[in-house]
Every structure is written in C-alpha cells, then in structure tokens.
C-alpha cells in the first residue's frame, strides 16, 4: 500500500536532506540569476537564494499570467502554477494582486537543463507581443 511508499520517501529525504537542499539552492540561484535582468517581468521576493525557499514567482508585466503559464506548458513542457496561490494578502503586499504570479517550484529531481529551458521560455514570453 501507499504507506510503504511514503515511508520510503521519508527515509530517502532524511538520508539526503542536505544534498537535496544544496541542489535546490543551486538551481534556484541559477534561475534567479537568469531572470534578474529580464525586461517585461517582475521577479517577486528576495533577489538571492538567501532567506528564500526553492519557489520562484514571476509576474509577466502587461501580459496575462494564465496565458504565459499555458504557453510555458504547451510550448516548452514546463509545469507551473498561476494565480494567487491561496495567498491573496501576500500578493497584495507584493503588488501582484489581483493577477497573481506564475510560480516555479524547484525540486530535487530538476536539472540545470530544465532551469535553463524555463529561463529561456520566460525571456521569450516576456518579449513576445
């Protein structure tokens, strides 16, 4: 049953926590660095990986974030989440309410190539009309 899979996953995470954390931190830094100077987007949150988790939120300025997220998935194979992420007050404080953001969640199985593809896709989508 599923409980055995959950147990195995928790054991794996306990054994690999530091490695996973460093991997996600490195990929997050790579993505932040790739997005920091992209015109046409607002990169929500802190500018570096210090003090943040491996979630990066982007607001496509003057574009529909939902359409940008759809294009990310259908043109580039990148799964994201779009909207207010059950946190409308956080988006009000970030200045992204009511549109929300496109959220990228980086995990232990993501690769540098996937991050580079995501950055390239954001750059293209931010510049297309």
Segments (PLM) and residue ranges:
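Pyridoxal 5′-phosphate
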Residues: 1-129
């Amino acid at each position: 049953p599923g409980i055995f899979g959950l147990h195995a996953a928790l054991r794996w995470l306990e054994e690999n926590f530091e490695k996973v954390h460093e991997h996600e931190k490195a990929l997050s830094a790579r993505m932040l660095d790739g997005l920091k100077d992209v015109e046409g987007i607002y990169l929500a949150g802190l500018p570096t990986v210090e003090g943040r988790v491996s979630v990066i939120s982007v607001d496509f300025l003057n574009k529909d974030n939902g359409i940008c997220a759809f294009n990310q998935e259908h043109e580039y194979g990148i799964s994201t989440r779009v909207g207010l992420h059950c946190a409308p007050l956080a988006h009000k404080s970030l200045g992204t309410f009511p549109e929300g953001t496109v959220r990228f969640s980086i995990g232990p199985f993501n690769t540098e190539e996937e991050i580079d593809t995501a950055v390239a896709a954001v750059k293209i989508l931010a510049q297309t009309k």
